[in-house]
Amino acid sequence: MKFRILFFLLLINSYPFFGQIPINNLVGIESISNINSEFFEYNGYINKNKNFIFFNRSNDPNNVGGIKDQGDVWYSKKVFDNLWTSPENMLELNDQENNLLLGIENQNIIVFTNGEVNIYNITDAGTKLISNSFIKYYKSNSNILSGSISEDKKLIVLSADSYGSYGVEDLYVSKKLNDSTWSSLINLGSSINTSYQETYPYLSSDNSRVFFSSNGYDGYGGFDIFYSDRQDDSWKQWSQPINLGNKINSEGSENSFIYDSNSNIISFSSSKNSIGNSDLKFYYLNLDKNDLPSSDITNFSSIEDGQKIILNKVFFYQSSHELLNESFDQLDLIFNFLNENQNLTVFLEGHTDNIGNAKKNLELSGKRVQTVKKYLITKGINKKRIDGKGFGGERPLISNKSSSSNKLNRRVEIIFNKTM
C-alpha cells in the first residue's frame, strides 16, 4: 500500500456546482491519504462521526476475486488525531462480483451487486444483512459499473452498459418502488449521454443535479468531472454538462465525485500524481476559514490490541537512518498518545526500499527502528514499552518504480499492544 502526503489549499472562484452553496476554498485532508494503494480507489465515504471511511478498491490481489475483481468494499478506522488504520477488506459483504458501494447512512452500508441492493448494519459485533432488494429486469453487458444512492435513499443512479445505451457506459436512474423492488433502469437520454463513456454518477441532495465523469466532452484530461441539471421529471432532459474546472480536473483522469453536505467533505478519485492507478482525495469545503477543523483534536478513539499503523509522515533519507524534518510532527503525535495511554506498548517495524544490497538494507532498517525508538525515549517514553525489528526491503508497500514510491517504502510501521 502507498501513503502519500496531501496538504494544500485550492482557491476556487465560487463555482456554483453545489446549488446555492458558494465555494470559497477546499482544504486537503492529509491524514486520509493513507488509504490509497498501487491499485484503484474510488467512492470514498466518511461516516457521520468521522472515524470510519468506506471505499471501493479494484484489482487488488486481496479482493475476494483477486486481481480481476472489479470492486470490493474496504474500510479504514481513525485511531486518534491524524492516524488511520491500514485499510482492510470487508470480506463478509464482498464476493467475486463487482461490489459497488452506493453510500452509507448512520451505521449502514449500501452495496449494489449484480442487480441486488443490499443494506448491511455495521456494529462492533459484526456485519449483518438487514435489507435486500433488487432492480427489475437489471441487465449489464459488462462487469464495469459505478453509481450511488440519493440522499433520501429513493433513487439509484448507475453507469452501465445496459438497455438503450448510446455508447459504452451510459447514465441510468432507478426509482424505489417498495422495500424490495426498484424500477427498471431509465436511460438519462442523449442530452447527457454520449457515444463515449459516462461514469460515476452522483446526485445532489435535492436530486436535481447529477455529477459524473466522462471522456465524451471536451476536458483537461482523459476523464473529467462534469455536472448537469435535470430539466423535468422524465429524467431524460438535462442541461448542457459543465466541466468543474481545472481546480478539480487535471491532465489525468478524475472520477467518483461525492459531496457530503452534513460534514462538508468532498471526495473524488484522481490519477494525477498518483503512484497507483487512481487515488482518493478528500477535502473540507468551508464557507468560512474560521470554520476549518482544528488540527489539535484530542478526542482519541479506542484502539484494538495488535492494531498496526503506518506512520505515513515519518520518512528517511535514502541509504540513511536520519529522519527527514517532516517526520517529527507525527512522532510527537505518537509520543502524546503513548503518554496518554500508559497501558500501551509498541512494536516498531523498520522498512527500506529494495534498491541495493539486501544485507545492508536489513541492517539499515534496524537502525531506523532504533532512531524512532531513541526519539520516543528521549521525549520521555519508558524504553521497556518499545521494541522493534528491521525487515529491510522484504515488505515494500508498493513496487519500487520511482523515487516517490521509494520514499514511501522507506518507512516505519508501529503496532500497539495493550498490557492490561
Q: Which residues does each predicted region cover?
A:
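Solvent-exposed, polar/charged alpha-helical surfaces in well-ordered, non-transmembrane soluble domains
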Residues: 88, 186, 329-336, 346, ...
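Sec-dependent N-terminal signal peptides
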Residues: 4-14
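Periplasmic peptidoglycan-binding/tethering modules of Gram-negative envelope proteins
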Residues: 285-345, 419-420
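Sec/Tat signal peptide C-region and signal peptidase I cleavage site
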Residues: 15-19
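Periplasmic OmpA-like peptidoglycan-binding domain that tethers envelope proteins to the cell wall
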Residues: 322, 349-420
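Short, conserved micro-motifs composed of acidic
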Residues: 20-310, 326, 370
